[in-house]
Amino acid sequence: MALQSAPKLLYSSPSPSVFSANERRVAFSDFVGLSKKRSRRRRIAGTFRNFPALSAVSSAIKAVVDVDRAHHSTDSGSPTVSTSSHPLDQQVVNLEDILAERGACGVGFIANLDNKGSFQIVKDALTALGCMEHRGGCGSDNDSGDGSGVMTAIPWDLFNDWGKDQGIGPFDRSHTGVGMVFLPKDDLLAEEAKKVVLDTFAQEGIEVIGWRSVPTNVSVVGRNAKETMPNIQQVFVRIIKEDSTDDIERELYICRKLIERAASSHTWASELYFCSLSNQTIIYKGMLRSEVLGMFYYDLQNERYTSPFAIYHRRYSTNTSPRWPLAQPMRFLGHNGEINTIQGNLNWMRSREPSIQSPVWRGRENEIRPYGNPKASDSANLDSAAELLIRSGRTPEEALMILVPEAYKNHPTLMIKYPEAVDFYDYYKGQMETWDGPALLLFSDGKTVGACLDRNGLRPARYWRTVDNVVYVASEVGVLPMDESKVTMKGRLGPGMMISVDLSSGQVYENTEVKKRVASSNPYGKWVKENLRSLKAVNFLSRALLENDTILRNQQAFGYSSEDVQMVIESMASQGKEPTFCMGDDIPLAVMSQKPHMLYDYFKQRFAQVTNPAIDPLREGLVMSLEVNIGKRGNILEVGPENASQVILPSPVLNEGELEALVNDPLLKAQMLPIFFDIRKGVEGTLEKRLNRLCEAADEAVRNGSQMLVLSDRSEELEPTRPAIPILLAVGAVHQHLIQNGLRMYTSIVVDTAQCFSTHQFACLIGYGASAICPYLALETCRQWRLSNKTVNLMRTGKIPTVTIEQAQKNFCKAVKSGLLKILSKMGISLLSSYCGAQIFEIYGLGKDVVDIAFQGSVSKMGGLTLDELARETLSFWVKAFSEDTAKRLENFGFIQFRPGGEYHVNNPEMSKLLHKAVRNKSESAYAVYQQHLANRPVSVLRDLLEFKSDRAPISVGKVEPATSIVERFCTGGMSLGAISRETHEAIAIAMNRLGGKSNSGEGGEDPIRWRPLTDVVDGYSSTLPHLKGLQNGDTATSAIKQVASGRFGVTPTFLVNADQIEIKIAQGAKPGEGGQLPGKKVSAYIARLRNSKPGVPLISPPPHHDIYSIEDLAQLIYDLHQINPKEKVSVKLVAEAGIGTVASGVAKGNADIIQVSGHDGGTGASPISSIKHAGGPWELGLSETHQTLISNGLRERVILRVDGGLKCGVDVMMAAAMGADEYGFGSLAMIATGCVMARICHTNNCPVGVASQREELRARFPGVPGDLVNFFLYVAEEVRGILAQLGFEKLDDIIGRTDILKPRDISLMKTQHLDLSYILASAGLPTMSSTAIRKQEVHTNGPVLDDQILSDPEIIDAIENEKIVNKTVKIFNVDRAVCGRIAGVIAKKYGDTGFAGQLNLTFEGSAGQSFAVFLTPGMNIRLVGESNDYVGKGMAGGELIVTPAENPGFRPEDATIVGNTCLYGATGGQIFVRGKAGERFAVRNSLAEAVVEGTGDHCCEYMTGGCVVILGKVGRNVAAGMTGGLAYILDEDDTLIPKVNKEIVKIQRVTAPVGQMQLKNLIEAHVEKTGSSKGASILKDWDKYLPLFWQLVPPSEEDTPEASAMFEQMTSEGASLQSA
């Protein structure tokens, strides 16, 4: 297929067009790392529909497909078929295997409702696929696609032609199956594999008719993909013994499973893969770019290839080594997204294998096991689960409603109008754990085609229907040219929604129709009502049960410290929420500590970053649930009332009475299992033996019918020789044992324990298998606290809130529940039932024997304690409780707050004093003392276990690169102005600019006054920055790195164009997966001005970026930022955790210039204690994994690697360099050097030296000067020089990635004897470029973009330069992304955010790509005639944006979705008018923009802090969540709005204030004038009728404004009268 030439841009303007026909050709040679060969081969397969009027459009799309990609990827390895002879002996579900495969995609389907097969459907699918190339990735060769493919009906005409030629056709369609097979590349091995296939079919009585070598064009395959390209063949079989389609499909499914099992013992097993084996569908796919797919497979070019439908898929994988089988579609599904709960899902699927039975399998269930493959991707495993259900008789729609249910509990419409659907979900909630995570799922079994969206609606999905009876669904609109007059319906899938096409009947079933049909198939409501029991709430105890001495002994025995009791339990009992703290976790890891730790401390929570988003549990709680079902889970393949026989709990937190009620439930047959072990014969081996006996007892109890096991450490009297097994170890061991023995589905594990009091501990127990926990000692501690004289006195004097004894316990449980929601949400998980058993933790410091017995599959990279050592640590608590000199109070271990004699804190007072002395006195000797202090400290971090080595002779320091060169690699952390004071923020920036290093603005914007050099300094003071001292003329206070965080506060076009680098903060070391909130008391007038908000109004930063729900979304934001400022480098900040290397690969392919790896020990202004202590990992492991993965994938040279988190000195810098870092970040140390005294009260706004306070009287005490920080960094650089000289190296470049200069220290600590540091010391090789060369590379480019051509027009240039008015009209396509962003950048650089007096009136016609009209500035008036995708108007600071459908559409505009999700995100000005509906999260985090739209999805106006939004149609759920400023007006014609509004903050009222009425009417009038809206015109025509139907949403900050208060004018006039009087 020849590449068609591109047409001219279709402009209409007063003057002739200046754009030539060649201007929009594909021009890849400008891209970083792309060769001419690549440019020539960049083509799109297939042709467009023959719409004569749009032929130019077709050609244009072909010419511009993906002109902006400079980042690509592929996958690694091949899926491993289980080699087990029995499914229960299969490989353990290992998190590291799962984390190696992550990704996202672009997907869609086309279906003809008349069920007419045509080649046009196939061509259109390939065209649409090509127009989503930007959603895919390529490997390090820039040419091997991550994967693309199509699923269609079997092209019988094509195959019959071939069959006739071979003398074996035509085929009997009703009894012929076709397999699309990847065989081993080696010819001999391929023949072996074919023999296994033949033998298996023969064994099943199925005739193999013939094999067909699939004709392919290998020349279009990328180098990496070609190396692993399989031998691709098709096998044709005849099935005579079955007649029905379902039975034939089942027989083929069994055959495929048997072939996989037979092949598993061969070395080539992983190279044999059936893409499809069916009588209905076939899949063509491979590690190919989307535009190459149709050229690679000649079949797809053959007009005899006809199909009534096609599903297409383009993959973006974070991994890069080609892996052909993981291209999609899978056998039933095309998946765009990621399953967060995959490890738990696989464990539970493995657990249910023995219980799965169905008559349709005729006793052959054993032959179709296993149902999952831990070596495959999450998408492949979800497909396997769906395949099992569908082949067992479920429809695809029903299967996906079971696996991926919507958030039905808080859905008023569903509960009122479709109760049968609610009953269906209630029934299956106890049978199948949700496969949770972002997911747009396309599905087909050949009879139906459809799509559904996850419960959170986190992937885009648009659909439309035409007059010729074709339905389209796609990740983006504009992937095909459409005559709008022939489009009869346009819409989008919202959260949890589904659309289905029945190919035989030609019916299209939209969401509620699908759900109702499925749910009505059985009497689920009757079964649930009769069998599902709810646990009734039982009152908390009103008296203490233990004497003071007894409770003290219990607390000591079970590992409590005074900090645990006072700062955690008592705080939660008093406040009802989790306590917060600050400054990060600066104590040793548990395995390196000299203090005893509870087992939980060896576990770190995992969290979402990049590949899936975190959730806001406070503002989006409607999608979350802590409900738990207790009891036996039934056979998922059969339905019946007995499956509903369970007890439902509202949460997993039980009090004593509720536990007793469960134990007494006769149907559960609860069995109590005590967990004490006897040490009278010694400790060695005792714990392991007792665990084995516990597991055997659990096994026996389940076989005897117990549906609830209660593991308990409760005893009337504790015995000194019978300590309790760590409850987490007991739960994990029993859970794993029951899985391995096929018994796990028959029972629930409930815990009755003293060893649980923090949210992290609850999460660990649930994550490793417990369904519910009764924390009896924590509840007793709450009771004792409430009854103590001290508490009574504090309540009497009003120093703490007054609570009853019952309320204290209720508060504690409330805090635990909210903490659990936060832990789930930071991983992006909505349901506790999905979290249970999902093992979403990383282990630091436990040995293989511990992991194998209780935590199989969890990541544990460094080994650690053995079972016997763990027993001794447990015993150390027990011994203290029974020793003769037992303390009369709990010990304070100092794990949270520094205290003399407590746990060692790296950031201790002595360290701070030594550093202050060195930098303030500019004393080298004092710095040497500081160095010695660090060198002599206890082992605290992983790098303390390492030391340098070298085979080189030392050299003179004079030969080493100068300190001035080294300091250029230093940067400071992203500390927001708001969290820290203006004085601190500016002093740090000035110091870094003096050095040539980089400071980081943090979130919140930056005062433009800081962008100019100081010229008015006299005696160290400047009238420009009068609050600072120690200044010099020429100083600048600008932050070289400007941060884009989730709240987008202060992010304006001018802010971005004045950056040297832009950092996208995905996560923060001290609280990864969480957002933030700047309290109103810290929002001064100055802070409010910078953040475009009001003083005193709390400012909420969401947990996720709402334009980053996947890896391709991140690539889009990077694209947006490169668009507005092509000269800036874009960095992405990640936090160390298992799998970060895989994520980093995707980030590198997403065109990031810098990747920053942050350690868990980074600082924070405020965070929950559990997050500070128990989330994130050491940067040593994260950096090593990132560097090694990038090296292995050939991506290391693309990015600068930066590291931060607890760096203190030159030794730390050298260690980080050896592990692969190019640059080095200092956060807490930079603050200490500028005056911080580590008071650790940042979160209170009471910092005694004004470093972290907005109180003016405290800020006046700020002691720092920029020179102090300059001195510190120069000392660090000189220290680096000294070490380099000792090792014999002349420059840092020489050691970066050289782990061979590191070796383990000869040191033996109490708990580190079995630590294995080989992971850190491993080497994957070195980059092919030096670090300096990598750092000096040009910024990654977006390549040729539409904005560049617009900016080349002389009239546009003249209008910008001379502030004139110009009018232009431009054609636009979905591949044109971030259009207007570069134009806005040019204007902002010249005029700032408000200075441009000209007008650029640009009209775009067509379907705009993502981020249309991004970062608009005043003077830019943009009109789109057509439709757009996600992120319209993102970050706009001014101007006007109008979106209207094309003229004479075949649909009603007010009923159609014409803009996508997350529009107006972070807007700080301007107006937008949309004639039609928007998707989810319209106006999220809007600051000052005004908008009119005719309907929205869920979460509209979320986190708004200003501006005004008018909605003239229906809205989704959760309106105005987190909205602290601005106003919203919503038309409510059918009286359904109020239940949809999140009432936590806003007040709902009618529009009664005359000023508000005028504001509303003026905006609607403008909307009608600019868009021609018929809906708006109808409202204005009958204003008196419609005005009372509007609601006004008013947050507290707006209550006294004239727009919201009808009393305002009266009060104003009365005040004026009084003044005149």
UniProtKB/Swiss-Prot annotation:
Q: Does the keyword Metal-binding apply?
A: yes
How the protein assembles, per its UniProt entry?
A: Interacts with ferredoxin. Interacts (via FMN-binding domain) with SQD1.
Identify the domain of life. Eukaryota
Q: Name one GO cellular component term.
A: chloroplast stroma
Q: Name one GO molecular function term.
A: glutamate synthase (ferredoxin) activity
Species:
Spinacia oleracea (Spinach)
Supply the name of the protein: Ferredoxin-dependent glutamate synthase, chloroplastic
Give GO BP annotations, semicolon-separated: ammonia assimilation cycle; glutamate biosynthetic process; L-glutamate biosynthetic process
Name the residues that bind [3Fe-4S] cluster.
1236, 1242, 1247
